[in-house]
């Protein structure tokens, strides 16, 4: 058993008291990102090791694995704690997103270790979508690289406001203050172009040696700031969704018998209480909340992030994909939107293509009307292109098959975040963040020949069950 964990349980007065104490700790979700070989997995391993979160059998196994797969000579290869895939261990890299949990006396943490290689950028975006803070690793020998810029931009695009720039491998540059200062100024010059009001902090450290990770470094007396762990324990996280209006996407209509009809889902933002007047969209029908049902019994109110089932006083037509919100709020359904896209497929995203999209519990189709611009990661400039390639990031105009109720992603990630699904393979090919809902549908481009338009009209007339879209943009 983990001796540190056993000591904590003893101090709390038993397992039950310890578990209650854990429930009342705040939770911080963060990810490590940066270029390949910057030491992301090693840093997480060091955090787990120095906070004594490794079980004795894991430590013994780590000693054996370090001899077989390690890249640190006679030292423990802490990266092996999170690099679990055989291909990762053989190549000494991270491919998949690895999640780890640990806690200290002050806070609980969920870590997402994301890959640094450019071809795995889509994995990094997936890991960042649920996080509140990003640790950006920079190799002190190499400075700010393209992947550092790419991951910084994706993190801010996904709504992360807290960035900790961890300048790693300081032991390989003789713990030079000049090197740290130069990289800090270089990154701040780049960060001035990033969107949003960001909280950026810098920590010089050595994940391999443990300098400034969980304890102060004796080799960097010139640095008087907090350690990385102190930053993680004290950073103030304010969830945007808590202050936003109520949004409840219906995931499932629960009808176990004739006497019960509830609408199950996770409250995306705001709060809801018994007796509150709510409105179902897109129908616009109103009712009152009669009960809030949870696994632990009925509640009088619920808050953002909680999984609940709402029972209404009236029997109204609500199905999966509908949205419940406060009755006095106006949120019109829109036929189109401009969307920030991270493209994840080998086949480029091009104007005129149609995809299934899923947003909250709603699934429909969307047509790509145009690509306004992709973003050049090196300098965050915009340029004109014909398509968006694999790992490309850009602003895209979409028109939906049916009007959708949307929020801007920065206001509500649940009702403003969507995924693109290939209609043939059913594979997720892209992630989208609503930049701006639009009340007017874009006019489809006239790039189709007369034969294609006639064939399209013929198919829609005689085979309506195929669901073919009108190439001219009409339904």
Swiss-Prot record:
Q: What is this protein called?
A: Sulfate adenylyltransferase subunit 1
Alphabetically list the UniProt keywords.
Answer: ATP-binding, GTP-binding, Nucleotide-binding, Nucleotidyltransferase, Transferase
Q: How does it assemble?
A: Heterodimer composed of CysD, the smaller subunit, and CysN.
Residue stretches making up the tr-type G domain: 25-239
Tell me which family the UniProt entry assigns to this protein. Belongs to the TRAFAC class translation factor GTPase superfamily. Classic translation factor GTPase family. CysN/NodQ subfamily.
Pathway(s) where this gene product acts: Sulfur metabolism; hydrogen sulfide biosynthesis; sulfite from sulfate: step 1/3
Which parts of the sequence are annotated with region: G5? 206-208
Q: Where GTP is bound, by residue?
A: 34-41, 113-117, 168-171
């Amino acid at each position: 058993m983990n001796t540190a964990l056993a000591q904590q349980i003893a101090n709390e007065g038993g397992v039950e008291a310890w578990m209650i104490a854990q429930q009342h700790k705040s939770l911080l979700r963060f990810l490590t990102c940066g270029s390949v070989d910057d030491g992301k997995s090693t840093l997480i391993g060091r955090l787990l090791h120095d906070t004594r979160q490794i079980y004795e059998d894991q430590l013994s196994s780590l000693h054996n694995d370090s001899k077989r797969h390690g890249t640190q000579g006679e030292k423990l290869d802490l990266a092996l704690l999170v690099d679990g895939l055989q291909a990762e261990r053989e190549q000494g890299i991270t491919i998949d997103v690895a999640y780890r949990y640990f806690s200290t006396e002050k806070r609980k943490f969920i870590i997402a270790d994301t890959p640094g290689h450019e071809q795995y950028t889509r994995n990094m975006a997936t890991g960042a979508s649920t996080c509140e803070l990003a640790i950006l690793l920079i190799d002190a020998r190499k400075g700010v690289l393209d992947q550092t810029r790419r991951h910084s931009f994706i993190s801010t695009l996904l709504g992360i406001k807290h960035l900790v720039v961890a300048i790693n491998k300081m032991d390989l540059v003789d713990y030079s203050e000049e090197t740290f200062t130069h990289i800090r100024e270089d990154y701040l010059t780049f960060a001035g172009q990033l969107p949003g009001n960001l909280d950026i902090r810098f920590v010089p450290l050595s994940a391999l040696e443990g300098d400034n990770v969980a304890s102060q470094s004796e080799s960097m007396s010139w640095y008087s700031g907090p350690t990385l762990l102190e930053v993680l324990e004290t950073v103030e996280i304010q969830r945007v969704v808590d202050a936003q209006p109520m949004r409840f996407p219906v995931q499932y209509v629960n009808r176990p018998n004739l006497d019960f009809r509830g609408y199950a889902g996770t409250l995306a933002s705001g709060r809801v209480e018994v007796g509150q007047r709510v409105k179902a969209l897109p129908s616009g029908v109103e009712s009152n909340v009669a009960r809030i049902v949870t696994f632990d019994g009925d509640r009088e109110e619920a808050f953002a992030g909680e999984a609940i089932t709402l029972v209404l006083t009236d029997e109204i037509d609500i199905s999966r994909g509908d949205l419940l919100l406060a009755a006095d709020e106006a949120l019109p359904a829109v036929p189109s939107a401009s969307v920030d896209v991270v493209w994840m497929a080998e086949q480029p995203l091009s104007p005129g293509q149609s995809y299934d999209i899923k947003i909250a519990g709603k699934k429909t189709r969307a047509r790509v009307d145009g690509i306004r611009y992709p973003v050049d990661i090196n300098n965050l400039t915009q340029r004109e292109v014909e398509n968006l390639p694999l790992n490309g990031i850009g602003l895209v105009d979409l028109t939906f098959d049916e009007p959708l109720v949307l929020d801007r992603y920065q206001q509500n990630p649940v009702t403003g975040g969507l995924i693109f699904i290939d209609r043939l393979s059913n594979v997720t090919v892209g992630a989208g963040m609503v930049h701006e809902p639009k009340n007017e549908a874009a006019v489809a481009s006239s790039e189709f020949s007369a034969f294609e338009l006639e064939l399209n009209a013929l198919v829609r007339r005689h085979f309506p069950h195929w669901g073919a879209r009108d190439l001219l943009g009409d339904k």
